[in-house]
Amino acid sequence: MRTKNNFAYIDGANLHKGAESLDWKFDYKRFRIWLREKYGVEQAYLFLGFVPKYKDLYTRLQEYGYTLVFKEVIFDGEGKAKGNCDADIVVRAMQDTYENKFTKAILVSSDGDFSPLVKFLISKNKIEVILSPYETKKCSVLLKRTGVKIAYIAEQQSILEHKKH
């Protein structure tokens, strides 16, 4: 851990879907600890759509140390929930940057829609790393083109895999 007071901005839907694509069970509690120990993350914002039936999960995530930022969910034509949190992540990260609330940002997403945010954070010397929930070939080329270091969650199985007790 090099610096402290780093903030993580986590695209909850992207992390969830990326974790589901792994051939091992992702552990959110271990992930929060790892963010603190490896990247000095003091504040981990987890952005997600609010679905009432998952309230027990939300409670557990808060107990693990995440700050949950909810977005109202809308449902598409097939009944799939959509949280659409991208703009919320961008606004929070930019606001925190302008208010100088953190040393470095860690972005957890594979979504190329965040490349303008990454470029902004580069211009302010405020980005540490992008943590991609998806493997390298599924991580957006737009993020790769920013030149920011990208680490792949799939490569951290020994640390982040849920262990049966």
Regions found by a protein language model. Name each.
Residues M1-H165:
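Terminal and domain-boundary accessory regions
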